[in-house]
Regions:
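Conserved, well-structured ligand/cofactor-binding cores
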Residues: 1-458
């Protein structure tokens, strides 16, 4: 038995692996683009398959396909989604900029399975791709896959991170530490205030991501080749959105201007910008954890992160902050992905953006990476760290910046003199203030109480 079979397309005959579900156009793409070895993301292929099912159902309702043809296409998609469908989608990310190769890959695979279901020929172009163009189905799939990934992965992960931070903040509320600006000693803060800042950052990022959902759920489908809707039924866009909403449980609607949705990727660029904002917040939190955990003897040593693995192949006993480090690398990757998406978003020359596959890949990678990193940061770093109270107390007792609380009483210059003397002599600020002011020790103990200073005011 031969390892290959002959398939035909508009360019002629081509050898295709005998057991492959795809046909000639997919094989041409495999041959043309041996670039990265990276396939389109699973979330993207899943969304593309769901879109094909929704299209078939809409076309049956609009009498563009027979009930049998549409049913066979829907059944084929169900079979793929229930199986290891990625093995049937070998096309490289770096392919034709419209994503036509991935669209035809889906059309051919579905057509093969649907033909088996129907017992008659289902055509990849005429039936599976009915009323569609790569130029609207791929932008649509980018929106759908990103919206589903936000709903299913990233937003739940960020909510979990906020919940863990808030729970930890309540647990460490009684701990007061030296605040730092410019990495230099500053006025005291509660540990709960530090974590409260983190929580607010993540909640803000979450809110900004949610604001992109209405635009993501607005689809290019129905615009076909250039936005005019040529060869699509006038009611196809609405029918497609309705069917897709039923399939996914997410409300999708036809876009108001299909020319904009096909010729640009502004929504993807906007979403990527908010993903970058979220990445910056995660980077800040990761770095705060690393600094507070630094030491254990020669660093700040304010907290102790959970020990997860040996930290060195040469230094016995060394343990490193691996989860914050991994999170920081994820943040760096997301920031880099955003730069690529911004450049790709500029490539909407006239009626079509021609960097769609790399936009899809980077967008979905950013969402997945941050969803996974957020949960790890929550569960393996924030939830389990321990506070080193003795280190906090030692640093606070020697912090000359506490004298800031005396500014309204003795003035800035006098307070600065006391701070410098305390620092130079390595003495507690309260002892130096006792010598340089007329305030009593009991008064100074009240005025310089770190816990009270965390409340602000005069």
């Amino acid at each position: 038995m031969s390892d290959t079979r002959i398939e035909r397309d508009s360019m002629g005959e081509l050898q295709v692996p005998a057991q492959a579900l795809y046909g000639a156009q997919t094989q041409r793409a495999v041959d043309n683009f041996p670039i990265s070895g990276q396939r389109m993301p699973a979330q993207f292929i899943r969304a593309l398959l769901l879109a094909k099912s929704a299209a078939a159902k809409a076309n049956v309702e609009l009498e563009q396909l027979t009930t049998e043809q549409g049913g066979a296409i829907v059944k084929a998609v169900e079979q793929l989604l229930a199986d290891d469908f990625l093995q049937h989608f070998p096309v490289d990310i770096f392919q034709t900029g419209s994503g036509t190769s991935s669209n035809m890959n889906a059309n051919e695979v579905i057509a093969t399975l649907a033909s088996r279901v129907l017992g008659d020929a289902v055509n990849a172009n005429d039936h599976v791709n009915c009323g569609q163009s790569s130029n609207d189905i791929i932008p649509t799939t980018i929106h759908v896959s990103a919206a589903l990934a936000l709903h299913e992965q990233l937003l739940p992960a960020l909510r979990h991170l906020v919940q863990v931070i808030d729970t930890k903040a309540a647990q460490v509320h009684h701990h007061v530490k030296t605040g730092r600006t410019h990495l230099m000693d500053a006025m005291p803060v509660r540990m709960s205030q530090v974590l409260g800042g983190w929580s607010a950052q993540i909640q803000g990022a979450q809110g900004h991501l949610e604001m992109t959902l209405p635009s993501l759920q607005s689809l290019a489908q129905g615009g076909t080749a250039v936005g005019t809707g040529i060869n699509a039924h006038p009611q196809f866009a609405a029918g497609f959105a309705c069917q897709l909403s039923r399939l996914t449980g997410v409300e999708f609607v036809p876009g108001e201007n299909l020319f904009a949705l096909i010729g640009s990727q502004d929504t993807a660029v906007a979403l990527s910008g908010q993903l970058k904002t979220t990445a910056v917040a995660l980077m800040k939190i990761a770095n705060d954890l690393r600094w507070m955990n630094s030491g254990p003897l020669a660093g700040l040593g304010e907290i102790e992160l959970q020990a997860l693995q040996p930290g060195s192949s040469i230094m016995p006993g060394k343990v490193n902050p691996v989860i914050p480090e991994a999170t920081a690398m994820v943040a760096a990757q997301v920031i880099g992905n955003d730069a690529t998406i911004a450049i790709a978003g500029q490539s909407g020359n006239f009626e079509l953006n021609v960097m769609l596959p790399v936009i899809a890949r980077n967008l979905l990678e950013s969402i997945e990476l941050m969803a996974n990193a957020s949960r790890l940061l929550a569960d393996k770093a924030i939830a389990s760290f321990k506070v080193n109270e003795s280190k906090l107390h030692e640093a606070l007792s020697r912090n000359p910046i506490l004298v800031t609380a005396l500014n309204p009483i003795i003035g800035y210059l006098k307070a600065a003199e006391i701070a410098k003397t305390a620092y130079r002599q390595g003495r507690p600020v309260i002892d130096v203030a006792l010598e340089h002011t007329e305030l009593t020790r009991s008064q100074l103990e009240v005025l310089l109480d770190p816990e009270k200073l965390t409340a602000g005011g005069i």
